[in-house]
Structure formats: structure tokens, C-alpha cells
Swiss-Prot record:
Family of this protein: Belongs to the RecU family.
Gene Ontology BP annotations: chromosome segregation; DNA recombination; DNA repair
InterPro entries, per database record: Resolv_RecU (IPR004612), Restrct_endonuc-II-like (IPR011335), tRNA_endonuc-like_dom_sf (IPR011856)
Gene3D superfamilies, sorted: 3.40.1350.10
Main location (coarse class): cytoplasm
Organism whose genome encodes this protein: Streptococcus pyogenes serotype M49 (strain NZ131)
Keyword RNA-binding: no
Protein name from the UniProt record: Holliday junction resolvase RecU
Enzyme class at the top of the EC tree: hydrolase
Catalytic reaction annotation: Endonucleolytic cleavage at a junction such as a reciprocal single-stranded crossover between two homologous DNA duplexes (Holliday junction)
Length: 202
């Protein structure tokens, strides 16, 4: 585990949030993982020229490779070249979009150990440059997904440096429920369109 210096200060969330209606369609019932559903959603947006959003590659340094068979190589040792920031980034209607996706089986909270300081700092930098930054939080047991603006995540993290889990009530109050769909499966751009581009979220 890598420790990073902390230089963020506490902030207070003072925003008005809305929730969208929930649809009963669930990608998990179709055998898809949360990440696969997001990737399929991004493919849908790309194929219809709605947005260009991709999963960021993780830079890895391969150290050792075994060859159990001549036609097959097995990586047995590798290291991350640098700390990752967020999972996805791209552009939508001229706006830079950057977000992280997390999943938990817990019913009452999202573990903050899933978030690292360098990710929080990266999100703060994106917001400083007026980018659209958020996290998609999926509660697999509840079959509920939420769009939480990055500022709400940052503010909660700064209370105790991310040592406590984030209650689902906080997420529901400060975020937006994402209505599952067939195409796309996780229509998070609807949240952006309705509440950030021409909406009343500040």
C-alpha cells in the first residue's frame, strides 16, 4: 500500500440534489458485471456519436514471465508504474467527463477504503478545471446505482481522511439514483444532461 501526503482541507457540502426514477431492469440479472455494464454503456454512446468515453488503461511494468508452453505466456510478477487516478474519462458535448466506478455488497454504506487520496486529489483538480467529475456507486445486494458528484465525495473524505464508510443515506441525499435500462444499461449521461447541463445543480 502506498501512502500519499494529505493537503486537502475540510469543506461543507451545500448543494441541492435530485434523484431520478428507478427502472426495474437490472444488468446483473443478465449476467453482466457492473464494469461490463458501464463499458457496454460507453460503447452504446460511442456507436451513436453521443459521447466518447473510454476506460483508462493501467500502466503496468512486467517483471517476470513464465512459459509453461511454447504457445502460452504467463505473467507471474508485475508492478504498477504509477498510481491510477480514475477509471474513465472522455468528452460529452464539449465537456470533459471523468469518473470512478465502485461496487459493494454492503447494504448500508460504501467503504471509503475503496478510494485513495491521490484519486481524491485528481478529482479536485478536474473540478478546478471545470470538468464534470463524479463516481458511480453500485450496491449489488440492493441492485441500486448512484451518481455522486465528486464534490460530495471530496467533502465526505475530508471529514476524517476517508477512514469511515460513506452511509447510503448520505449518498441518496447528495447523489442521483441511476435508472437501469436495456440500452444503455447505465445511462449516467441522463443525470449530467438533466442536472448539470441546463439543470439547476450548482
Amino acid at each position: 500500500m502506498v501512502n500519499y501526503p494529505h493537503n486537502l482541507i475540510r469543506q461543507k457540502v451545500s448543494s441541492v440534489q435530485k434523484q431520478t426514477k428507478q427502472n426495474k431492469v437490472d444488468f446483473a440479472n443478465r449476467g453482466m458485471s457492473f464494469e461490463a455494464a458501464i463499458n457496454a454503456t460507453n460503447d452504446y454512446y460511442l456507436s451513436r456519436q453521443i459521447a466518447v468515453i473510454h476506460k483508462k488503461p493501467t500502466p503496468v511494468q512486467i517483471v517476470k514471465v513464465d512459459y509453461p508452453k511454447r504457445s502460452r505466456a504467463k505473467i507471474v510478477e508485475a508492478y504498477f508504474r504509477q498510481a491510477s487516478t480514475t477509471d474513465y474519462c472522455g468528452v460529452y458535448k464539449g465537456h470533459y467527463v471523468d469518473f470512478e466506478a465502485k461496487e459493494t455488497r454492503q447494504k448500508t454504506a460504501m467503504p471509503m477504503k475503496n478510494f485513495h487520496l491521490h484519486q481524491i486529489e485528481h478529482m479536485a483538480c478536474v473540478l478546478h478545471q471545470k470538468g464534470i467529475c463524479f463516481v458511480l456507486l453500485h450496491f449489488s445486494t440492493l441492485k441500486e446505482t448512484y451518481y455522486l458528484p465528486a464534490q460530495a465525495l471530496i467533502s465526505f473524505y475530508q471529514i476524517d481522511n476517508g477512514s469511515k464508510s460513506m452511509p447510503i443515506d448520505y449518498i441518496r441525499k447528495n447523489g442521483f439514483k441511476v435508472a437501469f435500462g436495456a440500452f444503455p444499461q447505465v445511462p449516467y449521461l441522463n443525470i449530467i444532461e438533466q442536472n448539470f447541463l441546463g439543470g439547476d445543480y450548482n
